[in-house]
């Protein structure tokens, strides 16, 4: 830019400009600012062109529809409620390729969850169209009660305020809708579920089965409203569950005893659930959420001769029986045989509830998971854990089949827990999922047992077939703990020829802080992985 000689003198010195020079300089400043603005606009335009062209070259545009579908499936998981459905539809609005990929992935459309406001005559065809996009894949429908503890039918005349479970669109869907694999129902009371059964009708047309009749999986959650305590008839043919379809997977949420029996849980011993034996005999998977006193669990399990997976949620309540209970005496004298059962999962169970193992015999058991309540130190010292567990395993003769042992919140003293694992030598997977855990003492004890194996051939081998160790929600920021685990695993390699992986879900230590231990483990054939934690607490 040409600059006047007089202005050049001012710009190259520290002299103050005259009024005339000030006016001239200000004029030059405005010209320069204008040119800068033009250049900025040109730069922004060029940057936008660059982004467009780089976007056109992006590998994302060349992803096959199958890969896009896999990515979409990871971003919208589970049974899709209104928010999940909106997220899936938004993916299809990005571009034509994404829309084709989302519509072409049948499993994205295989489930839907609605409440009564989203399940009506207007939306019925939309629900059917959504599920039909899944092609021949198994379909899941969930009817989610808005308020699980309340329904209008409790306080009003049903003619004026109909029960939520008498929803015409719901009845139509279960009667003439698309074939369903799984149905999830959340009802505010057993009376509401009876209303649904009455509207569906008990007698199936064998020549024309309804979606209700051909269900393979049913999850039924029953709450108990204040005005509807449990008053089911004792006669089996009049049972609430008598007309359930012949599913192979049942997830049953029994009402909480405190609400179902007006604060007197012992009344649960005088009633019968009366789940039909023909239904229980056909189950391969059975999940039961029940805190009732009495032998209700045994009464149902005695018919589950084909069950393969059993999950029992005790809701933090201890098992209590009558002293003269016939089933308790029967299965104490001769354990209940469940020949095909390979997976047991006890949830929210007091440690004394492991006594349920005293009644069972499972020769095919492969996977055992215990999710326990937390206890004080005094409680732990008095708790009996090993005896019923090990007696159960011995009576079942499943030492050779039991492969996976998952313990959550079982904060036993370190010595007891180490001894329990020592008595299960054929485990291939051990998962310790504890928030409060004396890890240093435990792993030092495990290392002691492993070291003793090498020095004394007569002692039981310490996890000689271990292939996967998971320490979930257990911090590994303590280098001493890491070293203790590493010493055990390295000693274990001397008697274990199988590849082994150590997985953690809680890592606060830097990689450098434990780099040496991890390198030594890798040299011994043990890989280290940090995995996501899926626990909500």
Residue ranges, per PLM feature:
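Leucine-rich repeat
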Residues: 1-537
């Amino acid at each position: 830019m040409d600059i006047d000689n007089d202005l050049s003198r001012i710009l190259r010195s520290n002299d103050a400009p005259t009024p005339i020079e000030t006016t001239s300089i200000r004029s030059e400043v405005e010209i320069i600012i204008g040119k800068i603005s033009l250049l900025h606009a040109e730069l922004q335009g060029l940057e936008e062109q660059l982004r467009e062209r780089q976007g056109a070259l992006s590998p994302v545009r060349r992803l096959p529809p199958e890969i896009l579908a896999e990515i979409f499936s990871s971003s919208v998981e589970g049974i899709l409620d209104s928010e999940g459905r909106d997220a899936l539809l938004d993916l299809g609005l990005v571009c034509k390729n994404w829309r084709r990929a989302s519509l072409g992935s049948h499993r994205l459309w295989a489930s839907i969850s609605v409440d009564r406001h989203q399940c009506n005559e207007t939306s019925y065809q939309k629900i059917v169209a959504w599920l039909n996009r899944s092609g021949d894949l198994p379909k899941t429908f969930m009817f989610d009660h808005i308020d699980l503890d309340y329904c209008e039918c409790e306080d009003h005349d049903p003619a004026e305020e109909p029960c939520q479970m008498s929803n015409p669109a719901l009845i139509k869907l279960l009667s003439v809708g698309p074939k369903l694999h799984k149905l999830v129902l959340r009802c505010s009371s057993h009376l509401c579920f009876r209303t649904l059964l009455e509207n569906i009708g008990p007698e199936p047309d064998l020549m024309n089965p309804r979606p209700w009749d051909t269900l393979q999986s049913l999850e039924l959650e029953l709450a108990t409203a204040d005005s509807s305590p449990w008053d089911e008839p004792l006669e089996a043919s009049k049972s609430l569950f008598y007309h359930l379809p012949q599913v192979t997977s049942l997830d049953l949420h029994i009402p909480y005893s405190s609400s179902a029996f007006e604060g007197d849980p012992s009344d649960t011993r005088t009633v019968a659930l009366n789940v039909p034996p023909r239904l229980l005999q056909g189950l391969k998977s059975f999940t039961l959420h029940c805190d009732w006193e009495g032998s209700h669990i045994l009464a149902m399990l005695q018919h589950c001769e084909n069950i393969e997976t059993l999950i029992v949620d005790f809701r933090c309540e201890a098992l209590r029986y009558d002293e003269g209970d016939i089933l308790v005496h029967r299965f104490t004298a001769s354990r209940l045989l469940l020949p095909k059962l390979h997976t047991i999962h006890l949830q929210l169970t007091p440690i004394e509830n492991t006594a349920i193992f005293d009644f069972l015999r499972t020769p095919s058991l492969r996977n055992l998971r215990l999710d326990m309540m937390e206890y004080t130190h005094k409680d732990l010292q008095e708790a009996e854990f090993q005896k019923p567990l090990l007696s159960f395993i011995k009576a079942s003769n499943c030492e050779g089949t039991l492969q996976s042992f998952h313990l959550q919140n079982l904060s036993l003293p370190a010595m007891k827990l180490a001894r329990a694992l020592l008595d299960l030598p054929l485990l291939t997977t051990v998962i310790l999922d504890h928030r409060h855990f004396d890890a240093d003492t435990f792993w030092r004890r495990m290392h002691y047992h492993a070291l003793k194996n090498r020095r004394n051939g007569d002692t039981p081998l310490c996890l000689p077939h271990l292939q996967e160790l998971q320490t979930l929600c257990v911090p590994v920021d303590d280098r001493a703990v890491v070293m203790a685990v590493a010493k055990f695993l390295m000693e274990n390699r001397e008697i274990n020829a199988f590849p082994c992986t150590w997985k953690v879900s809680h890592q606060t230590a830097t990689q450098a802080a434990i780099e040496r231990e991890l390198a030594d483990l890798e040299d011994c054939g043990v890989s280290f992985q940090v995995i996501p934690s899926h626990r909500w607490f």
